């Protein structure tokens, strides 16, 4: 199963960031593309940053997506699908990424 844009998956981000929920931000890849996905990680340890965007969803613990954590990883590190964010939440996170990157 290829992770889809707007879905939240448990992903293995390695020893430093561990396994945690992450929002899939990239479009699905095709057979000719590299099997990579771009994700934004979710945290429950908030610091009060303007780049921590809180999201309420039944499949997530209280916390926020950290738009400073844009990361591209191999799709095989997406372990299991948790659910899909609403279009409103997805737009809010996209806007946060634009602010962070000044796009």
Give the ranges of each region predicted by the language model.
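Conserved functional hotspots at enzyme active or ligand-binding sites that engage polyanionic ligands
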Residues: 1-103
